[in-house]
Each structure stands twice: as structure tokens, then as C-alpha cells.
A protein has these predicted regions:
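C-terminal catalytic region of ATP-dependent kinase domains
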Residues: 211-308
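Hydrophobic residue at the +6 position relative to the catalytic HRD Asp in the kinase catalytic loop
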Residues: 206-210
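Juxta-kinase regulatory segment immediately upstream of eukaryotic protein kinase catalytic domains
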Residues: 1-31
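Conserved ATP-binding subdomain of kinase catalytic cores across diverse folds
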Residues: 28-173, 177-178, 193-200, 212-219
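Short loop/turn hinge sites at secondary-structure boundaries
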Residues: 22-27, 31-37, 199, 284-298
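Short, glycine/acidic-enriched loop or turn micro-motifs at the edges of active sites
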Residues: 198, 205, 223-224
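Alpha-helical scaffolds flanking conserved acidic
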Residues: 186-191
Length: 308
């Protein structure tokens, strides 16, 4: 992308599309004083763990500075933070609380994305990786073995167990093959729709966080909103199936919110390019027209690597 078309770092004005509690969190993230507590070493880009304090309120958060982003061949430099904020805006417009409150602001090391920290629920090694009737790991010889939250490995010679959806075959230590599955979970299904909308090219298992009170969040949305089809995800279990009625209703709300000169469109225009805003609207329209979950296109790897 030529330099003039790149989206420069800058502040975003966040009109409250979330319920009041989330709105107060975005005010805290936007106006609070950031203090860096440490760096998350396993992240591919510079990710700092911080606390933010504003008007007597304190919260933990993640700060990803634009200057710490690694160059990518297919995304313009210095735009990943803006894409993370755009993903939050779109998720809020859908009416789903699947992405933690996220803002664009100045930080101790320059402009970047600041996102509320999510405390992930501890998962015991023997627990099933998903809810809703999934068999217990070890219940029988073909039962799924959890590999992370909402993901599991199952017998490659059998269909996906009840309560799980097949993703594909995976090599396991020792040279064997297992069936990688994800939970047949309504929260994951919403996230699959969101990923199709924002054209997420990196939905890995490690980007799924569950909380002690049963909420699900997706994180790491920097490689999104490309104008070309780059959907790459683990959540293919519903491919080709009709969209749930609640997803169709949410997409209809989003289509309305993306109207010309609408507040959401104005906010997105400060975060991604005009062509990317147009492509976003086209994807929403295509999902509504088809009424089904997308299927892998074949021109782009369908599953990210590593998947978990």
C-alpha cells in the first residue's frame, strides 16, 4: 500500500456503542495514567502489561505500541493497533461483548492500542475443553483430550464426538494423527461470525480467553480488515451451515450502522482505509445474502500456524 494510503497513528473518539459499564472502562483506558509493569515475552510484537489509573479507578491492561509492531508483507506498517480498535468497534456494533474494551491513545512509548486485561479462568488438565455436553476427557478411548480452552484432540478414525465440531487432522507426537475439534458453543459461533466480518487472518486457539464467570473473549485482532479474502481461523466447524437467527439480526444492525456518514463509519474511517471500510460493508452484505457461515476459499491457508 502506498504511504499516502496508510492510516497514521492518532486518537480515536469512541462513541459509546457498549452498555454503560463498558463505556466507563473505555474512559478509564483513554484518560488514565499508564504505568508499565512488564513485557509479555511470548508475544510476536511488543506487548506491555500495564496498570491504568483515572479518577480513583485502577485496572490492568495491555499496551501495544505502534513502534513495536513487526513488519508484515501483506499489511501496511504501523496499522495493527488501529485494526485492533476497529475490531472492537465492529464487535460492539454487533451487540456482542467478545473483544475486551480497546482504545487508541498515546502511551509511555508513543501511540498504541490499550486493551483491558482479561483474567483467564484456570482450567484443570482433566476438564473438558468445552461446555454443552462435550464428553469428559478420558471417558472412553475415543474421548477428546483437551489441548486448550474450547479445543481438543479426538480419534481421527471417528466423527467428531457429540458436542464438538471438527476442524481438521493434526499430527501429534509420535507420528500419529488426531482430529482437532472445537466445542459446539454459541459463544464460539458468534466469534466465528465476527471473524468472517472483520476478515481475521489469525484466529488461533491461544487467542481465546474464558473467564471464571463463563464469558469468552477473543484477542489479537491486528491482522484484520484486509480488502482481500484472508480469513484464517480454527473455527470452521459450522462452515456452510445456516447462520443463527441472532447472528442474522446482529449483522442487520451492523449493516445499518455502516451507513454513509454514520457514527461508526466515521470512527472506522480514522482507523482503516476507505477501501477497507467498503470491503467490510461488502462482507456483511455477502453474509446476509448467503445466510450461511463461510467456507474456506482454497486460495489462502484456512488454518493459522501454529493453530494453538
Amino acid at each position: 500500500m502506498p504511504a499516502p494510503e496508510r492510516v497514521p497513528p492518532g486518537p480515536v473518539t469512541t462513541a459509546p456503542a457498549e452498555p454503560a459499564p463498558a463505556g466507563s472502562v473505555t474512559a478509564l483506558l483513554t484518560g488514565g495514567e499508564l504505568t508499565v509493569r512488564g513485557r509479555i515475552a511470548e508475544a510476536s510484537n511488543a506487548v506491555l502489561h500495564c496498570t491504568v489509573v483515572h479518577q480513583g479507578r485502577t485496572a490492568a491492561c495491555v499496551y501495544k505500541r505502534v513502534a513495536g509492531e513487526q513488519p508484515l508483507w501483506d499489511f501496511p506498517d504501523g496499522t495493527l493497533a488501529q485494526r485492533e480498535v476497529a475490531a472492537y468497534e465492529v464487535c460492539a456494533a454487533l451487540g456482542w461483548e467478545l473483544i475486551p474494551p480497546t482504545v487508541l491513545r498515546e502511551g509511555p512509548y508513543g501511540p498504541g492500542m490499550v486493551q483491558l486485561w482479561i483474567d483467564q479462568a484456570d482450567e484443570e488438565p482433566g476438564e473438558p475443553a468445552g461446555p454443552g455436553g462435550a464428553p469428559e476427557a478420558g471417558e472412553n478411548a475415543s474421548g477428546p483430550v483437551p489441548v486448550g480452552h474450547l479445543l481438543a484432540l479426538a480419534d481421527a478414525e471417528r466423527p467428531a464426538p457429540e458436542g464438538w465440531r471438527a476442524i481438521g487432522l493434526a499430527e501429534v507426537p509420535g507420528g500419529g494423527t488426531a482430529l482437532l475439534v472445537h466445542a459446539d458453543d454459541a459463544r464460539l459461533r458468534r466469534l466465528a461470525v465476527l471473524d468472517a466480518v472483520i476478515n481475521n487472518s489469525d484466529r488461533k486457539g491461544g487467542h481465546l480467553l474464558t473467564t471464571a464467570d463463563g464469558r469468552l473473549f477473543g484477542i489479537d485482532h491486528g491482522v484484520t480488515f484486509h480488502t482481500e479474502d484472508k480469513l484464517r481461523t480454527l473455527l470452521w466447524g459450522w462452515a456452510g451451515e445456516p447462520l443463527p437467527e441472532e447472528a442474522v439480526a446482529a449483522l442487520g444492525r451492523l449493516a445499518t450502522a455502516l451507513g454513509e456518514e454514520a457514527p461508526l463509519t466515521t470512527r472506522l474511517a480514522a482507523l482503516i482505509t476507505p477501501a477497507e471500510v467498503t470491503a467490510l460493508g461488502d462482507r456483511v452484505a455477502a453474509l446476509l445474502a448467503s445466510g450461511t457461515h463461510p467456507v474456506p476459499g482454497g486460495e489462502w491457508p484456512a488454518i493459522p500456524w501454529p493453530p494453538v
